[in-house]
Amino acid sequence: MAKRIIYNENARRALERGIDILAEAVAVTLGPKGRNVVLEKKFGAPQIVNDGVTIAKEIELEDHIENTGVALIRQAASKTNDAAGDGTTTATVLAHAIVKEGLRNVAAGANAILLKRGIDKATGFLVDRIKEHARPVEDSKSIAQVGSISAGNDDEVGQMIAEAMDKVGKEGVISLEEGKSVTTELEITEGMRFDKGYISPYFATDPERMEAIFDEPFLLLTDKKIALVQDLVPVLEQVARAGRPLVIIAEDIEKEALATLVVNRLRGVLNVAAVKAPGFGDRRKAMLEDIAILTGGQLITEDAGLKLENTKLESLGKARRITITKDSTTIVAEGNDVAVKGRVEQIRRQMEETESSYDKEKLQERLAKLSGGVAVVKVGAATETEMKDKKLRLEDAINATKAAVEEGIVPGGGTTLAHLTPELEVWANSNLKDEELTGALIVARALPAPLKRIAENAGQNGAVIAERVKEKAFNVGFNAATNEFVDMFEAGIVDPAKVTRSALQNAASIAGMVLTTECIVVDKPEPKDAAPAGAGAGGGDFDY
């Protein structure tokens, strides 16, 4: 494949053109009066979105070099999304502003490496200042405010997320599902829940709702397939004597053993149900161990030298209540808190050690199931297009609230960055010199960009609004929904400090990379194949 090689100013200008295109497409969504973007899909209906990173992922340009610019700035959005889950549009607008300012200086002959160093130092200073200005999130009102701002000023969503956070705690998991109705609902599960139901519908104790509900049951946990009913007989006899129900969670139960259990259940000899173990491979074993710790039992596994036929009542777990439907099982246990705490710490350590985001997510789920519980938000909408948009907004809102709990909140609406401009200018003038100082001042000039854009999307003059905000106290900003200057904390217009910080760091990082680019190597577009010879001649006339 032949390559095109472009140097110096031409290279940077080509990147800039790509960045301009992407930034403009994303920036129209910023703020309470931001517009939507329609994305054409190869299959199905077009998607209407208001989410920066989703729009960025869709943009592909014909020109290879401009497309490289798009890919670079897209990285600022997706990295911010990975770190904080929101703030992708802010990151894009900021990166664009820093690149614009920086390229002007590079074109005038400034040393790009020193500029980048200045940009990095300025970013470090700003990150510390954001940390100092952040207020911890103490009540569910603040959480609701963060949630509703991220969901596009939807107070109902904010309340719902605050309620979910309240119930499941900081460690809990809030997951999203597509609901069946027009309204968005919140469902909170107490205890541990996993996505496996009873193996046979004959285990249902409530035939009307097709649920099996057991109070004060014993729990037999094993990671092997139960093939012979003889293995189970000793346990079944002990449980029958104790007069309590039994729930078996195993890798699988073969037909013969299953038939025996069903017959005993139907004859009323023993109140029993069997469920397949959740997960697969090593994760399955870990989840079974979690359940064992939660219920104060033992996992019957041959690795530990334990055999089914030798199992005693003491090895069985105990729960307050177990509810089993055809596709899920919920265990409510008042287990031994000390063991559960130890297990939670162990999972936390694993989370710190792992690099994979998939593993982290799975460990977080296990942590939530052990320590808090799980809240499910069922997203409701009239059409599928609206449903997808709502789901993206809700995802942002949930991520933003988690980020707020982690690092606190700062005034929203681009206010924090605009107010930090004068502080950065003072610090840079006294601590940096020459081109490093120029680099820091590039960042200072770019900081009000998100606020300007929010004001412009609301039909105001961005530059004027930004100047007026800078004159006011730190907490005072521009409320674009009402076109007024208000105390942002009182008005509930707040951003998580983590989102503002991540957006700034990723924007500065990508902008620094673009400014220090001196050469681009891209694939040469392949010439379109000419029509094969003779194909065009007399194409319409056939001799039969």
Curated annotation (Swiss-Prot):
Query: What is one Pfam family matched by this protein?
Result: Cpn60_TCP1
Q: Name one GO cellular component term.
A: cytoplasm
**Domain of life according to the entry:** Bacteria
Predominant subcellular localization, coarse grouping: cytoplasm
Q: Which keywords does this chain's UniProt record carry?
A: ATP-binding, Chaperone, Cytoplasm, Isomerase, Nucleotide-binding
* One Gene Ontology biological process: protein refolding
Which amino acid positions bind ATP, per UniProt? T29, L30, G31, P32, D86, G87, T88, T89, T90, G413, N479, A480, A481, D495
The protein's annotated catalytic reaction(s) are: ATP + H2O + a folded polypeptide = ADP + phosphate + an unfolded polypeptide
The catalytic activity of this protein is classed by the Enzyme Commission as 5.6.1.7
**UniProt GO MF annotations:** ATP binding; ATP-dependent protein folding chaperone; isomerase activity; unfolded protein binding
Enzyme class per UniProt: isomerase
Asked whether the UniProt record includes Lipoprotein among its keywords, one would answer no
* Xref: PANTHER family: 60 KDA HEAT SHOCK PROTEIN, MITOCHONDRIAL
Family per record: Belongs to the chaperonin (HSP60) family.
Role noted for this protein: Together with its co-chaperonin GroES, plays an essential role in assisting protein folding. The GroEL-GroES system forms a nano-cage that allows encapsulation of the non-native substrate proteins and provides a physical environment optimized to promote and accelerate protein folding.
Q: In its UniProt entry, what is this protein called?
A: Chaperonin GroEL 1
Say which species the protein is native to.
Answer: Trichormus variabilis (strain ATCC 29413 / PCC 7937)
Organism lineage: Bacteria, Bacillati, Cyanobacteriota, Cyanophyceae, Nostocales
Gene encoding the protein: groEL1
